[in-house]
Design a protein with these regions (language model features):
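Membrane transport/envelope proteins' first extracytoplasmic loop
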Residues: 3-306, 315, 689-767
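Alpha-helical transmembrane segments
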Residues: 4, 12, 16, 26-72, ...
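Interfacial "coupling" helices/loops that link adjacent transmembrane helices in transporter permeases
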Residues: 9, 13-16, 307-350, 415, ...
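Alpha-helical transmembrane segments, especially those used as permease/efflux helices
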Residues: 15-18, 289-292, 392-405, 428-563, ...
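Membrane interfacial helix motifs at helix-loop boundaries and amphipathic/re-entrant anchors
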Residues: 37-53, 253, 260-261, 273-303, ...
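Small-residue-rich transmembrane alpha-helices
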Residues: 313, 346-376, 389-414, 474-479, ...
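Short cytosolic juxtamembrane segments of multi-pass membrane proteins
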Residues: 413-440, 446-452, 874-886
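Juxtamembrane segments of multi-pass membrane proteins
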Residues: 493, 497-499, 503-661, 667-670, ...
């Protein structure tokens, strides 16, 4: 019975539910899009290219593993944890003998993969270029289509796609920047793969040259294993697993027959789809990044959606106050009213959820493509679209709508029928403002109390608002103590949402306080100003529903746009203050080769090579840099606060104050870490420095880091010299792509890289902001559309169309001022706490012009969303509206 009535009610009130439908549909689309990113991170396929012809691949373990054992209440709990390392781990070449003796093995092919960037104007078409030995071409396989195989150290075979793009053929010369100095090679042949290779460019060298460039003597990247005739891939995998498994395997390593089985100390055996992550390490790491991005976006979207949709349903229930009061008067129980509104919301939420989920699927694909274009996600991780994200969005939308309706219906379903009718009468006619105020003053004491309660705050709402406000303050306080970006970023946006939610609950009180402040200036604008003031004061609940999404929009936008500059400016300032060098040598390619630094030193320049990596201390990740110790204090000043950099060697390290605090280190202490390629190292701390934000948490010796990274080329070279820029350029002229920059120009280059990283965050939160902007327009339009009868009575009382529209503009601008103050205040508090935690100073980077633009956009949205429905409402004759039945 109640469901049938709810269906008829929705059918009869299609226009009234339009606002809620749009909000819910946008929320479902956003949740679905975020869900597809999360699904891709969890289940996305990484298709192998290089190892397509090798059904089984043996490679090194790409994880740092830790096992913890806890004894509690007579029980022993063992936990196994693993975190990925930043660089490629290598296997001993001697393992080939063991593999070759394994039953069912026809051939074992050692693989070497290393940096090999061809220096041509045509480039590689956005593909990453790798070097290999021609002996491993059978892994794909590649076959010669013209020319001959490489035999001499100067010979080179290139793939056909690159040859066509660069217009190269056998006999041509090609300069390649690999891990050593750039070298000119003679192209002896062109090869083509027999399977699709879409995400990389391959260059094949002679066996000896490949070993030299790989720079890991006695080690290989992986082994491709080809089965003997009649041996299946599964049987081959099982045989190799059995052959390689050692009794001394670490606790927690997998020995079951799974597609990926870590064995012994380093080796792992992979087959099927598990070969892809072995080949594309960045794609495997991107899984974690996508799960993080999708989860953060989805969680924020859900919180914002609930906040916005509750406001939408509050307005919807207010518009139906007279109808619901009448139902209460004719014996409808509180439970029946709640069930009616809840089922209406479920109907609207389900329909909107289906439509939004269908829209969210292409939106998720667009988001994935944008992340790929920005470099945040490699194209090798294939986008996955399953049934779970749209289904989850549908359920979340329907439940969100039902919850919002229950929250919005709490008061109307609880008050007595006579009181409901009295309030509905008080809110009728011009009772949007002055009328309601007059009726309140004229009523009895009990009536005045009830009407004031309706226009203001209930005790429960006030208490909930204060609790959330306190929660927001706690989050801000916690944020000021967080000193790592991964920890502080989610808390930053959560604090904005929680504080905005407290604004939603305390909104009526805030609106009334704002009216007291603005009453004087607004009243000076004439009768329309006085009427606008009365409307704002008399309809604080309705105006609060409008203020909430606008506050969230301004607060969230300011936070998103100013978080990265706050961090980037502080890091840039530390970098500028810490670079003592006269010049900085950088490269447009993969890096500055060591030979360039040697040539500068040969001319008596003071040179510091800088190579960057990421290491693990335990399972925690730290940014590290390797620097050449000789003459270091002439080119670099990290503001040492304890110890000295004079003792920096391959057996020692310097740490930032943050790392020293987290790891409880001081000069003379021992630092145990895992280098980028998984190699453990034990170092002695010789110095602690303050400028960790600009230079990383750990500083090691250059040679130590360079031996354990995929790209040993220097990211920059600091040069202290009396020579001019022109003289340095002349010295380095034989190194293509190398540039000599002033320290300020190098800082600008670093700023551009940070901007590229910031664009990922802008995109991640941009859709949430777009949804919030839609909610602002939707809520304002609903608020104005509700007041058709009020506008008609004002016109019958003598007001002109222009005066009514001016009143609406004054109301909208008043709401914008309040929302701008609240949103900006929330953003300032959150950004200040973020700045204190991350930089140690309460100095958020806020660009005044950008802030003014944000407020101006919010004002424009408010004015347009008010003017359009207002003009539409005023087109109908006032007498017709005033005499029509509600």
């Amino acid at each position: 019975m109640m469901l049938r009535y709810a269906l008829r009610s929705v059918r009869a009130r299609k226009a009234g539910f339009l606002g809620a439908f749009l909000s819910l549909m946008c929320a479902a689309a956003l949740i679905t899009a975020c869900g597809t990113l999360l699904d891709t991170g969890l289940r996305g396929t990484i298709r192998t290219e290089r190892y397509a012809a090798s059904p089984v691949v043996v490679s090194a373990d790409q994880y740092v593993r830790r096992t913890t054992v806890k004894h509690k209440k007579g029980k022993t709990k063992v936990k196994h944890k693993a975190k990925p390392i930043a660089e490629r781990a290598w296997l001993p070449e001697s393992l080939e003998t063991t593999l070759a003796r394994t039953p069912g093995v026809a051939r074992v092919i050692p693989e070497l993969t290393f940096l090999a960037q061809p220096l041509t104007p045509a480039g590689t078409g956005g593909r990453t270029a790798y070097g290999h030995s021609w002996d491993s071409a059978a892994l794909t396989p590649y076959r010669l289509v013209t020319g001959s195989t490489p035999r001499a150290a100067s010979d080179l075979v290139i793939d056909r796609d690159f040859a066509l793009r660069a217009r190269l053929r056998p006999g041509d010369r090609l300069t390649v920047q690999s891990t050593q100095a750039p070298r000119v090679y003679r192209i002896t042949g062109i090869a083509a793969p027999t399977t699709p290779v879409d995400h990389q460019t391959s260059l094949f060298f002679s066996a000896g040259e490949a070993r030299r460039l790989a720079a890991h003597p006695g080690q290989v990247t992986a082994f491709g294993v080809l089965p003997a005739k009649g041996t299946s891939a599964d049987r081959l995998w099982q045989a190799i697993t059995t052959a390689l498994h050692q009794p001394t395997a670490r606790p927690g390593t997998a020995t079951s027959l799974s597609p990926t089985a870590p064995l012994g100390s380093t080796a792992q055996v992979t087959s099927g789809d598990a070969r892809g992550p072995v080949e594309f390490l960045d794609a495997a790491t991107a899984r974690t990044r996508l799960v993080s991005i999708g989860g953060a976006m989805g969680g924020t979207s859900l919180l914002v959606a609930v906040l916005v949709v509750v406001g939408t349903f509050v307005l919807s229930v207010q518009q139906r106050h007279r109808e619901l009061a009448l139902l209460r008067a004719v014996a409808a129980t509180s439970g029946q009213i709640r069930r009616l509104l809840g089922r209406e919301a479920l109907i609207v939420g389900t329909v909107a959820g289906v439509a939004g989920a269908l829209l969210g699927l292409p939106l998720g694909g667009w988001l994935y493509d944008r992340f790929v274009a920005l470099g945040a996600v490699p194209a090798t991780l294939q986008h996955t679209t399953g049934v779970v994200p749209p289904l989850a969005a549908l359920i979340a939308t329907a439940l969100g709508a039902w919850t919002a309706a229950r929250v919005a219906s709490r008061r109307i379903s609880r008050i007595r029928p006579a009181q409901a009718l009295a309030e509905a009468e008080a809110g009728a006619g011009a009772g949007a403002g002055a009328g309601a105020e007059a009726r309140t003053k004229a009523g009895t004491k009990s009536t005045r109390t009830r009407l004031t309660t309706r226009a203001g705050l209930t005790r429960g709402r006030l208490l909930a608002g204060l609790v959330l406000l306190a929660g927001g303050v706690v989050l801000v306080a916690v944020l000021s103590k967080l000193r790592t970006e991964p920890a502080s970023t989610p808390v930053t946006f959560l604090a904005v949402v929680v504080l905005s939610t407290s604004v939603a609950l305390l909104g009526p009180l805030l609106v009334k306080a704002a009216v007291l402040v603005l009453r004087g200036p607004v009243r000076r604008s004439g009768p329309t100003g006085r009427l606008a003031t009365a409307n704002l004061r008399g309809n604080a609940v309705r105006m609060a529903s409008v203020v909430t999404p606008l506050t969230l929009l301004i607060g969230m936008t300011c936070t998103v746009l100013f978080v990265q500059p706050t961090l980037g400016d502080a890091a840039g300032a530390q970098a500028r203050e810490g670079v003592r060098a006269d010049w900085v040598v950088a490269s447009q390619g993969p890096g500055v080769p060591a030979e360039a630094a040697r040539q500068l030193r040969a001319r008596h320049d003071i040179v510091t090579e800088v190579v960057r990596t990421t290491v693990r201390v335990g399972l925690d990740k730290y940014v590290a840099q390797g620097v050449t110790p000789a003459g270091l204090t002439r080119t670099w000043d990290p503001d040492v606060t304890a110890g000295s950099l004079d003792g920096l060697t391959e057996n020692t390290a310097a740490v930032s104050e943050l790392a020293a605090d987290q790891l409880h280190l001081k000069p003379g202490g021992t630092l145990k870490l895992t280098l980028g390629d998984g190699t453990p190292a034990t170092l002695t701390v010789v110095a602690v420095y303050a400028r960790g934000l600009g230079f990383g948490d750990l500083t090691l010796a250059h040679d130590l880091v360079a031996r354990h990274v995929d790209n040993p080329l220097a990211s920059s070279v600091l040069v202290s010299t009396p020579r001019t820029q022109t003289q340095l350029v002349t010295t380095l002229r034989e190194f293509p792509g190398v540039r000599v920059l002033a320290p300020t120009a190098a800082d600008s280059l670093q700023a551009r890289r940070q901007q590229a990283n910031a664009e990922v965050n802008y995109l991640a939160m941009g859709l949430v902001l777009a949804f919030t902007a839609i909610a602002v327009v939707n809520t304002l339009a609903m608020s104005v559309a509700e007041r058709v009868r009020e506008f008609a009575l004002l016109r019958l009382a003598g007001a002109t169309r222009r005066q009514v529209l001016r009143m609406l503009r004054i109301e909208a601008l008043s709401v914008v001022l309040l929302a701008a103050a609240l949103g900006s205040g929330i953003a300032l508090a959150v950004l200040t706490a973020f700045s204190i935690g991350m930089t140690g100073r309460a100095a958020p980077s806020v660009t005044p012009l950008v802030h003014v633009t944000i407020v101006a956009v919010g004002a424009a949205l408010a004015l347009v969303a008010t003017a359009l429905p207002g003009r539409a409402a005023l087109r109908v004759r006032a007498v017709t509206v005033a005499t029509a039945r509600e």
